[in-house]
Amino acid sequence: LMINYIDRGAIATAAPLLQDELQLSPSEIGWVLAVFYWAYAPLQPVMGWLADRIGPAIVLAAGFALWSLSTAATGLVWGLASLVVLRLLMGAGEATFYPSALSLLVRNVPPTQRALATATMQFGAVLGPDIGTLVGGMIMLHFGWRTMFVVMGCASLTWLFFWRRRLRAERESQASSAVAA
């Protein structure tokens, strides 16, 4: 959760520089900040349905890849249209998080430990913007806003390397369920 909040908040850190370089009006930068939620909110139930069908670890990995790549690609935008498309894609990718993460939590954490697990997960939502603003600001200061997005998106993708183990376990579980049926 911390990683998606770091990536999600990067746009606010970069907004003044981005607005200046891309010559966006205040209302256009407002669109850029809001459009993320146009995909994020309505797609959460869809992603929950999808996680129930093909597995939450797989859906989360796909969403994670989409939002990380969207973050990295934001460093390559050329104007309002490309920025809006990437923010929509990022919203779609991040819409996978809550349904998938909560499904995984319920499946893997005993009922007596779920409150702590949920609180620990939510801690990332609080800590992520703080870390993202600090680290993103330092990267922007030294290398510019474009580099900040590329670095943050690519750094987020490294999480998938560690998530592979979880994906293997979910595929094996699905295969054994299919054989048993």
What would you call each of these model-derived segments?
Residues 1, 33, 37, 64, ...:
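Small-residue-rich transmembrane alpha-helices and their cytosolic helix-loop interfaces
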Residues 1-26, 47:
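Extracytoplasmic
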Residues 23, 55, 76-82, 110:
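Helix-breaking motifs and short loop linkers at transmembrane-helix boundaries and internal kinks
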Residues 42-78:
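Conserved MFS/SLC helix-loop-helix module at the cytosolic interface between two early adjacent transmembrane helices
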Residues 86-126:
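Cytoplasmic helix-loop-helix junction between adjacent transmembrane helices
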Residues 121-170:
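Helix-loop-helix hairpin linking two adjacent transmembrane segments in secondary transporters
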